């Protein structure tokens, strides 16, 4: 019974998590499609025409951190490939700059620059990159999985990994609990859902270009539940096969590529991971930061300049590498900061405004969304209270249980949205009289 129960949890985890992600993306996506505005402008409906700048800056700061983290991840794949050369390996081991090896710094700057080349040509180039990057990554992943399965002597979901090894790996990843247990799987699912916290907020940056509501749902269906579940299966098969071949649990593509005898397979793995990471980085972080920063200073900073500022901040963060350490802890801590914002925006759009937004007033500093001097006090209070429980207490104090931080984003959404709903009921918005 226990084995069946555990297996059912393993089966349900990617399905349930991907459906939650799909649902949340649709909620934000529909708002973007209907209003035709990006996240910083949509936020004006709930935060006020000036208060939205606060929401935009929070998202921009998070985007800069993620931009640096994803760039570092992609450059790590390059490093794993380069150190196969004895001279480069020696350079990697003996040269240190800015708290990193010289090779790591060079690879980081190269990946950082490559992203700028893609981005500086505008959103159409970003779209074309995504069009070919997605299929290319899938083809490479399948080749990698098939190659490892052949080398392992067959395909199997029976991993045969010792429990002590699994315990070490889950602890390294920042996930508590015994592998396969209910609470460990819950933590993995929560981290997976939280991973998309930044994109939930700014998905309307992309959905505003959709033809209709159905197009948003169809695109999300194929891109999220279908793609996520299939990709999880392939990744799982690859990890199991790699364990059977190399006797180690290798969680990162660059770790697998470092084991290959073939330069061709190593290059394929490195390029696959780099292309996939760059695709995520450009869409989820660069575009968002560019829109957010340019929205705060629209007269001085356009989309491209906003993106360049975000890229420079990510470059400046590299010596400090705040993303190094437990991946799950980083995802949950940084994602939690955006929970209250999402809760407030969704509650305002669907429960307070009932989906009826005066788009013209979003661009009028003296219009319906001026609130108190351009700031909606209800949203500010809800953000503050939500942030206390989602970010401040779990990350900077020991007042809450250790497990709380894993679900910080969820608490942020619920508490931030709940407080906003109560305050909007007690202090309904007042529409300024026409001048």
Residue ranges of predicted features:
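Hydrophobic alpha-helical segments and their helix-loop junctions in multi-pass secondary transporters
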Residues: 71, 75-84, 136-173, 195, ...
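Single conserved hydrophobic/aromatic residue that forms the stacking wall/gate
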Residues: 1-11
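Hydrophobic, membrane-embedded alpha-helices of multi-pass small-molecule transporters
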Residues: 107-108, 147-152, 167-238, 263-283, ...
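Membrane-water interface regions at transmembrane-helix termini and the short interhelical loops
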Residues: 29-30, 46, 54, 80, ...
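Transmembrane alpha-helical segments of multi-pass small-molecule transport proteins
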Residues: 56, 83-120, 135-144, 188-203, ...
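Membrane-interface loop-to-helix entry segments
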Residues: 58, 69, 106-151, 161-163, ...
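C-terminal membrane-solvent junction of multi-pass transporters and transport-like membrane proteins
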Residues: 136, 342-422, 426, 433-434
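Selective recognition of specific alpha-helical transmembrane segments in multi-pass small-molecule
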Residues: 16-24, 58-70, 135-151, 191-198, ...
């Amino acid at each position: 019974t226990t084995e069946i129960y555990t297996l059912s949890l393993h089966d349900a985890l990617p399905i349930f998590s991907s459906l939650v992600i799909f649902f949340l993306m649709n909620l934000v996506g529909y708002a973007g499609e209907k209003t035709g505005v990006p996240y910083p402008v949509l936020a004006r409906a709930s935060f006020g025409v000036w208060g939205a700048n606060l929401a935009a800056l929070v998202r921009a700061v998070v985007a800069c951190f993620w931009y640096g983290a994803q760039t570092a991840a992609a450059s790590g794949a390059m490093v794993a490939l380069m150190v196969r050369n004895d001279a480069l390996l020696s350079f990697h081991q003996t040269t240190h700059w800015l708290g990193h090896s010289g090779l790591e710094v060079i690879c980081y700057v190269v990946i950082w620059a490559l992203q700028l080349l893609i981005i500086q040509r505008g959103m159409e180039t970003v779209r074309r990159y995504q069009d070919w990057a997605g299929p290319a990554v899938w083809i490479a992943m399948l080749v990698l999985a098939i190659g490892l399965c052949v080398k392992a002597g067959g395909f199997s979901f029976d991993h045969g990994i010792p429990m002590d090894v699994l315990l070490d790996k889950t602890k390294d990843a920042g996930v508590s609990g015994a592998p396969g247990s209910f609470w460990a799987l819950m933590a993995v699912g929560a981290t997976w859902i939280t991973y998309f916290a930044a994109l939930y907020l700014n998905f309307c940056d992309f959905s505003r270009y959709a033809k209709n509501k159905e197009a948003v749902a169809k695109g999300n269906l194929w891109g999220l539940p279908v793609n996520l579940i299939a990709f999880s299966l392939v990744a799982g098969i690859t990890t199991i096969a790699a364990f059977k071949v190399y006797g180690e649990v290798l969680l990162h593509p660059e770790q697998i590529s470092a084991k290959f005898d073939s330069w061709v397979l190593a290059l394929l793995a490195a390029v696959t991971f780099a292309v996939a990471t760059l695709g995520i980085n450009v869409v989820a972080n660069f575009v968002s930061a560019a829109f957010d920063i340019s929205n705060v200073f629209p007269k001085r900073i356009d989309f491209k300049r906003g993106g360049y500022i975000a890229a420079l901040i990510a470059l400046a963060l590299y010596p400090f590498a705040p993303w190094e350490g437990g991946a799950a802890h980083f995802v949950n801590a940084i994602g939690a900061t955006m929970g209250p914002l999402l809760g407030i925006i969704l509650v305002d759009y669907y429960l307070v405004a009932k989906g009826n937004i005066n788009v013209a007033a979003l661009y009028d500093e003296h219009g319906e969304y001026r609130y108190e001097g351009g700031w909606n006090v209800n949203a500010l209070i809800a953000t503050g209270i939500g942030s206390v429980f989602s970010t401040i207490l779990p990350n900077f104090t020991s007042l809450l249980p250790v497990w709380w931080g894993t679900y910080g984003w969820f608490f942020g959404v619920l508490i931030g949205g709940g407080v906003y709903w109560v305050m909007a009921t007690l202090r309904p918005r007042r529409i300024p009289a026409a001048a």
